[in-house]
Design a protein with these regions (language model features):
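Active-site loop/helix belt of alpha/beta enzymes
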Residues: 4-117, 124-125
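Small-residue-enriched segments and motifs
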Residues: 116-118, 173-174
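C-terminal accessory subdomain/extension
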Residues: 123-241
Length: 241
């Protein structure tokens, strides 16, 4: 017995369970986001053919399912199939690329921003240290530091310590010292007159500058999807048109 028949047998057993009301059959593409790799394209085609064959076997056995779906974000863009009744858009809903920097054949724009507030501004003297471990020490007397109300408990990764920038008044300002649970510190010396209560942008646009989830992801070896999904529940969500 081939694996397609075995899968159809298992599906039939599940569908026959008393507490189950089956509406469809689906799979999930593993490498649909690699359109320039021949092996990945072939693998995705085989996945598609496999689920279609299992679906047809079930139909031939008199089992009718309303839905057949296997298209994720990349699949819907590169491997669309008229027999698929649904698409499961994920990362593309955030306006992010499934496999950054590989572009999609459609235009997408990031839709999520992450903002926080400056809670304190102070001047640093030469040799002053910032945050846990004293990993940052001021090199000079003309450095303005701003404490910002966001930290790794909000889902802004501690791995971005000393690596990422934050937008303040349209200027990129580097994170100095280690990111804390509830706050981080910026060098805002190049941002002009920064005051307490100033809104800063950790993800999104401010003036002509933009920081994307993909940019942050590249700084600590992950994907943009993890960055946006990692923002914790305690961060208020504001939905705009």
């Amino acid at each position: 017995m081939c694996i397609r028949d075995r899968c159809a047998d298992e599906a039939e057993k599940i569908i026959a369970l008393e507490k189950i009301s089956a509406e469809g059959l689906y799979t999930h593409f593993a490498v649909a986001d690699c359109p320039d790799d021949e092996e990945s394209v072939e693998y995705t085609k085989n996945q598609s053919d496999f689920i279609l064959n299992v679906y047809d076997i079930l139909c031939n056995r008199g089992i009718k399912l309303e839905h057949l779906h296997f298209l994720n974000s990349a699949g819907a863009c590169y491997h669309n199939n008229p027999r698929s009744t649904l698409a499961r858009a994920g990362i593309i809903m955030y306006g992010l690329y499934p496999n950054y920097p590989v572009k999609l054949p459609i235009k997408v724009e990031p839709v999520m921003s992450l903002k926080a507030v400056v809670s304190q501004v102070k001047k640093l003297n030469n040799g002053d240290s910032v945050s846990y471990g004293r990993t940052y020490r001021a090199d000079g007397d003309n450095i303005t530091a701003a404490t910002v109300t966001v930290g790794y408990a909000d889902g802004y990764s501690r791995l971005l310590s000393g690596k990422a920038d934050v937008l303040v008044k349209g200027k990129r300002c580097p994170i100095i010292g280690r990111i804390c649970m509830d706050q981080l510190v910026l060098d805002v010396s190049g941002a002009g007159d920064v005051k307490e209560g100033e809104i800063v942008t950790l993800i999104g646009k401010d003036g002509n500058e933009e920081i994307t989830a993909d940019e942050l992801a590249s700084l600590y070896g992950t994907i943009g999807y993890e960055v946006v999904c990692g923002i914790s529940k305690r961060v208020p969500r504001i939905y705009v048109d």
